[in-house]
């Protein structure tokens, strides 16, 4: 089996990595209700956010083969990386998105991820993380092992 990393799609000579945070939000006041109209609006906003991400990718990466992994998913399971992106992009101030203590994005109809351009780029799951890999990751992120396991979902 292959052992892939998103770093495989970044050239040692230098590459550009795109970072993004997007949202589409219903302008009506938020409610915790579960009525059909509210759920329908939330669902529509989530689909429009995905469409916005597709449009952004086409505008930015015309003619390039790219992937758009989101933080917290199989190729990059550490949700805490969203905080770094929010800080770099000043996302809370610019578009009004926030993170919960568990790194969920508010509003929930938002996305945060990266764009990587590489001819062989593809989506994958990191799979099992070895002890040496966990140690290295925790050292690079300046976190303890327990925090690393929690952030990576192990």
Predicted regions: what they are:
Residues 1-132, 140-143, 151:
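Small-residue-enriched alpha-helical segments and adjacent helix-cap loops
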């Amino acid at each position: 089996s292959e052992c892939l990393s998103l770093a495989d799609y970044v050239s040692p000579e230098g590459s550009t990595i795109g970072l993004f945070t997007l949202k589409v939000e219903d302008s009506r006041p938020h409610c915790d209700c579960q009525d059909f109209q509210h759920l329908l609006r939330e669902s529509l906003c989530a689909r429009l956010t995905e469409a916005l991400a597709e449009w952004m990718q086409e505008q930015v990466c015309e003619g390039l083969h790219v992937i758009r992994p989101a933080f917290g998913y199989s190729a990059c399971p550490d949700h805490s990386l969203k905080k770094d992106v929010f800080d770099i992009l000043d996302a809370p101030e610019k578009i009004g998105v926030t993170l919960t203590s568990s790194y969920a994005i508010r509003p929930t109809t938002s996305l945060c991820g990266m764009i990587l351009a590489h001819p062989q780029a593809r989506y994958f799951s990191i799979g099992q993380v070895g002890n040496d890999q966990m140690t290295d990751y925790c050292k690079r992120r300046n976190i303890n092992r327990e925090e690393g396991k929690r952030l990576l979902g192990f």
